[in-house]
Structures are given as C-alpha cells and as structure tokens.
C-alpha cells in the first residue's frame, strides 16, 4: 500500500494502481490515503479504480484507507474492506471542507474497532501501522479486526511493534509494505525526506488470486513479511507436526467464540492448542541471495540461530553490522 497525489504523494491514484500491476508486478495492492484528506468524492473514485483494475487470477485490489489518528489516540491503522461502497470511518475531518458526515468519525482507534463491531463489519481487516503517527497497540487493539502488525515499510523497520503485541499476548501475523508517497507500490525506494528504506513486501499464501481468497488469507494470518528489494521475494514454508492430537483454530479462542478442529499438522498463521506431547517444526527457505542466518523465536525469546556455513568457511574478513530503530516511532 501507499499514497498518491490526491492525499500526500505524487502521481494519480490511477497511475498508482497501474504501476503496481505493470511495473512492480505485485499480485495485490491497496491504496491507503490519510483519512483526514479523503473526501467523499475521492472515496468514490477509489472504489471505481478498484473495480477498474480488479481482475480475478491476475490482479487484486483491496478497497481501504489509513485511519490516521495521532499516536495518543491509538496511531495509524490500515483498514481493508472486502467490498466497495463502504462507510469510511475517519479519525477526523481536519483537511476536509465537507463536514456533512462528521458523525461517522472515530476519534480513537478503540472507537474505530467499536464502530466496526457495532455495525457487524466482520469482513474488515486492519493492520497496526507506523507512518506519520505510529500505532500504539498497547493502548488499542481488537483481535477480531486487527490481524497483523506492519514491521517494515519505506519509513524503516519496526520490530518493536510486534514485540509490543507479543508482550500483550496478542496472536497476530506480520506484514511489510511500501507506504511510499511517490506512487510506486511494490517497488518503493529511498530518496525523499524521511523515507530512508526500501519498501517491504508481504507474501500471501492462497490457493487462488481473488479478493475473497486474499482477505481470507489476511484473516488467518497466512503470510509473511520481507524488507523488499533484490532479495525480498524469498519463499518461506513453515509446517508444524505434533505427535498427539491438537485443536486448530483460525480465530483466537481467547477473545471470543472460535471454531476448532482436530489436527496433527499446522501451517503458518494457525493457532493450535496442544496440551501434551512434542512438536516438530519444518522450515524451508528459498532465497535469491545467500542466507546469513535464521533466527528462531518463541514469542520474544530467541530459541536458536542457524547459520548455513561453518567457522572454517568464514575466511579472514570482518563484517560490521548495525541494525534496529534509532528510537520508538519511525
């Protein structure tokens, strides 16, 4: 996702979708304009463009917007819909002259989730996002809608966001996106102001390329994130096998009624209750560039680091690496 000239960016929304499909060669994208800049006319235009560019089995467009409340109100959230012609619930009308639908505003992230629930919009999927106003998931989160944390974009890398979620016991997926403002979704590069990183990509594990399948994938957290660029289209397959019977869920049973089924195997994104026995996890990683290391975490705890080389193969060169956010935010 990203933005275009109608909100805060360059090139039109029409050119934005064309770039994603024809230049970045991504399979799916969404447009996430700051809500306080989205007029009702532009909201209708985005619906029209979603219909124009949507083509089953070739290119999927997810209607949506960025709920753009300040961090003190909950911070940025990406909101995606399964259909067009939906009610946009803005954080404010700050830059919109037409105030006729001011009563639909949700001034906090908690109010947004409450409004979605009150109106039974269970098909909506939200991501916690770090853009102009980083998300505070400890202040507001609703697992019925907010399925994932965005850990990388053109703004930088934000592993602390998913760490916050794990500290709170949330069961969430991980995504990465462009969020550039130059109209280049899927191929966003540094070069403007605070956008100092290559935009990220998300691999979506689905059987078919349709909007329904993509939304189902997002709800079930069957995806993973990369930091984009030349090595950003790696293939990762994760399978867990149990030596006893387990109960598998797609929805978190801790936050409400959830249908479970018996299983001896699980895939990426599944929630599993496994009271006894042991589990074996198989991970396959295919990468277009050499792999430096694979870190395996259990929540916040680093369990093991795997390096595909031996000490003798290192040679006599020293590599100096530094990483991590300079400060909480972007």
Regions found by a protein language model. Give the residues of each.
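Extended, charged catalytic domains and RNA/DNA-binding interfaces, predominantly
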Residues: 1-330
């Amino acid at each position: 996702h990203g933005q275009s000239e109608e909100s805060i960016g360059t090139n039109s929304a029409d050119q934005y979708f064309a770039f994603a499909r024809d230049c970045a060669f991504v399979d799916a994208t969404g447009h996430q304009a700051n809500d306080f800049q989205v007029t009702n006319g532009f909201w209708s235009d985005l619906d029209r463009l979603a219909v124009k560019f949507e083509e089953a089995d070739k290119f999927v467009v997810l209607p949506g917007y960025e709920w753009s409340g300040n961090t003190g109100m909950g911070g940025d959230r990406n909101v995606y819909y399964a259909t067009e012609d939906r009610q946009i619930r803005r954080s404010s009308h700050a830059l919109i002259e037409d105030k006729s639908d001011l009563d639909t505003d949700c001034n906090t992230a908690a109010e947004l989730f409450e409004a979605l629930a009150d109106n039974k919009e269970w098909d909506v999927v939200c991501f916690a996002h770090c853009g102009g106003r980083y998300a505070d998931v400890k202040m507001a989160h609703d697992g019925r809608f907010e399925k994932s944390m965005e850990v990388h974009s053109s703004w930088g890398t934000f592993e602390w966001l998913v760490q916050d979620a794990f500290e709170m016991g949330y069961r969430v997926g991980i995504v990465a996106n462009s969020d550039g403002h130059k109209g280049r979704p899927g191929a966003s590069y540094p070069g403007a102001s605070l956008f100092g990183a290559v935009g990220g990509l998300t691999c979506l594990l689905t059987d078919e390329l349709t909007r329904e399948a993509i939304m189902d994938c997002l709800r079930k957290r069957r995806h993973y994130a990369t930091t984009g660029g030349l090595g950003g289209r790696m293939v990762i397959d994760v399978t867990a096998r149990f030596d006893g019977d387990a109960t598998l869920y797609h929805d978190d049973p801790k936050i409400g009624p959830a249908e479970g089924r018996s299983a001896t195997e699980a895939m990426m994104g599944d929630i599993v209750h496994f009271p006894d026995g042991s589990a074996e996890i198989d991970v396959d990683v295919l990468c277009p560039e050499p792999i430096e290391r694979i870190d395996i975490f259990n929540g916040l705890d680093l369990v093991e680091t795997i390096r595909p080389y031996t000490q003798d193969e290192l040679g006599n060169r020293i590599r100096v690496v530094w990483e991590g956010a300079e400060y909480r935010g972007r």
